[in-house]
């Protein structure tokens, strides 16, 4: 029994020992794992930070090929760095849009991307995130220079992109810069070489490439074009070509826009390598956001301003943007609507403003809850104005792409919005067809004419009160016609179908201003029609014009090879026909009248016209030579035609033509022009002042009397001969001194006559007083007291002497000799009463007897009365 019990005890001890061994082994494994982990953590802490970052970058790069765009819903689903994800979360960017889902993965893999999506779909983040990740992968620093270049077409869009970049990339160590026009160039050039991510406009970037010596882009890694179709078109063609030449060929390129370009020529300029085309909404039913309600109205040109005012009065709590065709329209209508006070804030944004003013207007409109912004197409692309309710296109857009970008300022990122397009009857058919081809749903709506407010009379009153506002209205009129004429699609835009007189009245003008380029266009069209009707007559005219080419010049023939040249007419006939077709304004009639005053002036104008006709403009451009008051189309010289005589054929064929050209190129100086005017005996800028009696008081400029001046007027030599001018001035100075001397003598003569009259009156008064003298022997009461006011005023004659001293010393001596006054001292004081002598006396010498009786000029009774008064006062 004992053994059995002992055996059972031994069997119980063995499992307990095994359990203890197992627990020890488990503890040992746990301890070893813990020590291994601590050892690894210690090693990681000992490793430099850059090495840890590089390993993390390596893990991110390994995940790039595994990106599946269909599975991504958030930014955290992309293999992005912690710094980028933190910036996105802090800026409240969590969910991705369709364009971001499909382009970020391709850009992270280093491919060239052409992305197109609807307006307000988040294209800015689609290129900012890959740009940040690229520089983070390369561990870029400020010492490495420029790594990413973002080019925007407008300053406002560049500023908006810069703000988004600052939000998302604030946790990174890169430096970002904004380079746009309107800022201090010197300050920008001092900082530009430290910038890693540069956001700019094309013009200012090219200026820095030309003028900033230490700015270079040889290490550029990524080029991004925002609104690429606008940057690559004709407006920026030369600038972009120059910029691309300075960029390295080996780089990544991203192009984004709402209306993307597929031109092979444009893409070849950018040196794209196997680009990925991402058209997110290519298969969508409409090319505009589904939340956008789009309508159009048909309105006559003269009623458009009334419709706009009535619309704003009925939408006082809405935020609206009104697009115009030109800057002059925005400037004028902004001023007028500020005076009309529609009931909500009115702002203006156009290209003629200073940069700080543009930024102020942009930020002000962003903050306003209810306002209206008058803008040109600089606000049509990319700008993200929050909570815009209405987009009104006051002037018809150039094409469907411009329409899409304009209406894209509302209905941003799943928000609602409304768009209204104002069309003329001549524009309706062609524009609606274009929009239908681009899958833009537009519905026509009607206006209730009873709710339209007529503001034409109020505008006329404003123009009558303000001359500057009237000039702005005239510029607005001409600028609108020019913008319509320059449109490419002539099926939609026909300037000759516009009611010009009615449109001028709607702007507040009494009559339509003179539009010179339109008159010239109409003349050319009439000549063309007559030549098509009578081809035989046209050939005869061509022969006549060819025979007179030595006088007229050959450049116009090269521009118009069809031979349809205008018929030569005299200046008077042209002006007469122009006035019959278009009644000019008062200013125009004055100009035409002054042009035809003399035969010589008309000949000079014909010469100038011949010179201007040799300038190689195209037909559409040469009509703007006379209109220099509006510079909306100052960059149109891109379309000039340049021809060179390589083999010197023209000089051999027409030596007489070359001789005439050399004569015509001789420039007349301003001095010669002024002398020509003087020869015609025009009195320029003369001002003559007459008295009430008709006598000449003053003439300006004064007439030169010397013979040298008259001889110089007849001299045709250019420039100024200083020696001759000095001689003329000396001669003229003699005449001036003589004239001045005569004036002084006349002034002194008048003064002497006045003094004689005063002395004569004093003598007569003394003579009358002698017959009524009464002697006062004693002081008797207040009634018989001496009145000092009866004495003559001594200061009267003293002041006259002081005035004589100030006039001139010579005249003072002359008056002293003739007046002969006596000055005596009595009791150490100067006598208070000085009176002019009754007769002329000789000069007193200094050795004269001081005890001679003093002649005060008073009667005997007055002298006695004065003595008694003085004695009483001493006692």
Curated annotation (Swiss-Prot):
Residues 736-773 form a coiled coil. Residues 529-541, 569-580, 752-771, 810-819 have a biased composition (Basic and acidic residues). ATP binds at residues 93-95, 100, 117-124. Its EC number is 3.6.4.13. GO terms for cellular component: nucleus. It catalyses: ATP + H2O = ADP + phosphate + H(+). It is an enzyme of class 3 (hydrolase). Residues 104-278 form the Helicase ATP-binding domain. Residues 624-633, 800-809 have a biased composition (Acidic residues). The keyword Lyase does not apply. Residues 528-633, 653-672, 743-856 are annotated as: Disordered. A motif (DEAD box) lies at residues 226-229. Transmembrane segments: none annotated. Keywords: ATP-binding, Coiled coil, Helicase, Hydrolase, Nucleotide-binding, RNA-binding. Residues 291-453 form the Helicase C-terminal domain. This is Probable ATP-dependent RNA helicase DDX10. It comes from Gallus gallus (Chicken). The gene is DDX10.
């Amino acid at each position: 029994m004992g053994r059995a019990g002992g055996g059972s005890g031994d069997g119980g001890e063995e499992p307990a020992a095994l359990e203890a061994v197992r627990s020890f082994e488990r503890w040992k494994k746990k301890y070893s794992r813990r020590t291994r982990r601590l050892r690894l953590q210690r090693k990681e802490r000992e490793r430099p930070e850059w090495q840890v970052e590089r390993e993390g970058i390596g893990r991110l790069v390994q995940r790039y090929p595994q990106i599946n765009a269909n599975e991504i819903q958030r930014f955290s689903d992309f293999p992005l760095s912690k710094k980028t994800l933190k910036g996105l979360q802090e800026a409240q960017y969590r969910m991705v849009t369709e364009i971001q889902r499909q382009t970020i993965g391709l850009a992270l893999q280093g491919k060239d991307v052409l992305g197109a999506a609807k307006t307000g779909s988040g294209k800015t983040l689609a290129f900012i995130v890959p740009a940040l990740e690229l520089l983070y992968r390369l561990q870029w620093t400020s010492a490495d220079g420029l790594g990413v270049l973002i080019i925007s077409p407008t300053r406002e869009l560049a500023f908006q992109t810069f703000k988004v970049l600052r939000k998302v990339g604030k946790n990174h160590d890169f430096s970002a810069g904004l380079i746009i026009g309107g800022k201090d160039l010197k300050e920008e050039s001092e900082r530009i070489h430290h910038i890693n991510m540069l956001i700019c406009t094309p013009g200012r970037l090219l200026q820095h490439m030309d003028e900033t010596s230490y700015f270079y882009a040889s290490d550029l890694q990524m080029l991004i074009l925002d609104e690429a179709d606008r940057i690559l078109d004709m407006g920026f063609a030369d600038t972009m070509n120059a910029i691309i030449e300075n960029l390295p060929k080996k780089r990544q390129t991203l192009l984004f826009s709402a209306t993307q370009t597929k031109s092979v020529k444009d893409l070849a300029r950018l040196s794209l390598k196997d680009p990925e085309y991402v058209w997110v909404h290519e298969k969508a039913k409409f090319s505009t956001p589904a939340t956008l309600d789009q309508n159009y109205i048909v309105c006559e040109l003269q009623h458009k301003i009334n419709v706009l005012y009535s619309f704003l009065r009925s939408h006082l709590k809405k935020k609206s943007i009104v697009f115009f065709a030109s800057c002059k329209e925005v400037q004028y209508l902004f001023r007028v609507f500020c005076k009309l006070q529609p009931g909500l804030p009115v702002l203006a944004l156009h290209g003629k403003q200073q940069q700080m003013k543009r930024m102020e207007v942009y930020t002000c409109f962003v903050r306003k809850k209810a306002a209206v912004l008058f803008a040109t197409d600089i606000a049509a692309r990319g700008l993200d104005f929050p909570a815009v309710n209405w987009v009104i296109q006051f002037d018809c857009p150039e094409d469907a792409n411009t329409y899409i970008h304009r209406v894209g300022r509302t209905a941003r990122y799943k928000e609602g919005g409304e768009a209204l397009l104002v069309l003329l009857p001549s524009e309706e058919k062609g524009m609606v067809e274009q929009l239908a081809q681009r899958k833009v749903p537009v519905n026509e709506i009607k206006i209730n004419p009873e709710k339209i407010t007529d503001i034409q009379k109020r505008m006329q009153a404003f123009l009558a009160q303000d001359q500057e506002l009237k000039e702005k209205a005239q510029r607005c009129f001409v600028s609108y016609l020019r913008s319509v004429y320059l449109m490419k699609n002539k099926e939609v835009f026909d300037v000759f179908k516009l009611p010009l007189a009615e449109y001028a009245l709607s702007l507040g003008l009494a009559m339509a201003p003179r539009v010179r380029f339109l008159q010239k266009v109409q003349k050319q069209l009439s000549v063309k029609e007559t030549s098509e009707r009578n081809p035989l007559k046209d050939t005869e005219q061509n022969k006549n014009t060819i025979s007179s080419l030595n006088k007229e010049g050959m450049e116009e023939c090269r521009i118009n090879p069809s031979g349809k040249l205008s018929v030569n007419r005299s200046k008077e006939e042209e002006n007469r026909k122009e006035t019959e077709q278009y009644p000019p304004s008062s200013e125009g009639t004055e100009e035409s009248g002054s042009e035809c005053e003399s035969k010589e002036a008309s000949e000079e104008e014909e010469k100038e016209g011949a010179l201007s006709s040799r300038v190689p403009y195209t037909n559409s451009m040469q009509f703007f030579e006379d209109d220099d008051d509006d510079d909306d189309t100052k960059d149109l010289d891109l379309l000039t035609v340049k021809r060179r005589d390589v083999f010197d054929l023209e000089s051999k064929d027409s030596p007489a033509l070359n001789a005439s050209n050399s004569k015509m190129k001789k420039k007349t100086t301003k001095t010669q022009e002024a002398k020509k005017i003087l020869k015609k005996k025009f009195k320029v800028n003369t001002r003559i002042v007459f008295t009430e009696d008709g006598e000449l008081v003053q003439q300006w400029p004064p007439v030169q009397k010397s013979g040298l001046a008259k001889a110089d007027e007849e001299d045709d030599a250019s420039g100024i001969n200083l020696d001759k001018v000095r001689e003329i001035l000396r001669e003229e100075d003699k005449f001036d001194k003589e004239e001045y001397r005569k004036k002084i003598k006349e002034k002194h003569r008048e003064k002497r006559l006045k003094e004689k009259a005063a002395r004569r009156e004093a003598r007569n008064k003394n003579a009358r007083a002698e017959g009524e003298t009464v002697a006062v022997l004693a002081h008797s009461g207040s009634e018989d007291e001496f009145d000092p006011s009866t004495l003559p005023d001594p200061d009267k004659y003293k002041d006259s002497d002081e005035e004589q001293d100030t006039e001139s010393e010579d005249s003072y001596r002359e008056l002293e000799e003739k007046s002969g006054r006596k000055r005596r001292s009595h009791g150490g004081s100067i006598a208070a009463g000085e009176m002019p002598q009754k007769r002329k006396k000789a000069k007193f010498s200094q050795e004269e007897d001081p005890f001679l009786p003093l002649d005060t000029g008073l009667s005997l009774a007055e002298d006695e009365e004065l003595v008694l008064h003085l004695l009483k006062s001493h006692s």
